[in-house]
UniProtKB/Swiss-Prot annotation:
Belongs to the NPY family. GO terms for cellular component: extracellular space. Transmembrane segments: none annotated. One of its GO terms (biological process) is neuropeptide signaling pathway. It holds the Pfam family Hormone_3. It is found in: Secreted. This is Peptide YY-like. It comes from the Eukaryota. The modification Tyrosine amide is found at Y36. GO terms for molecular function: neuropeptide hormone activity; neuropeptide Y receptor binding. Keywords: Amidation, Hormone, Secreted.
Length: 36
């Protein structure tokens, strides 16, 4: 499996959080695609 995206710190900017959430969504899509 690809590595899970690391959560930005609590002091991260909104842009960092947006990138993190996009990476998590992509990560979940990769895993569910492999599973089914």
């Amino acid at each position: 499996y690809p590595p899970k995206p690391e959560s930005p710190g609590s002091d991260a900017s909104p842009e960092d959080w947006a990138k993190y959430h996009a990476a998590v969504r992509h990560y979940v899509n990769l895993i569910t695609r492999q599973r089914y």
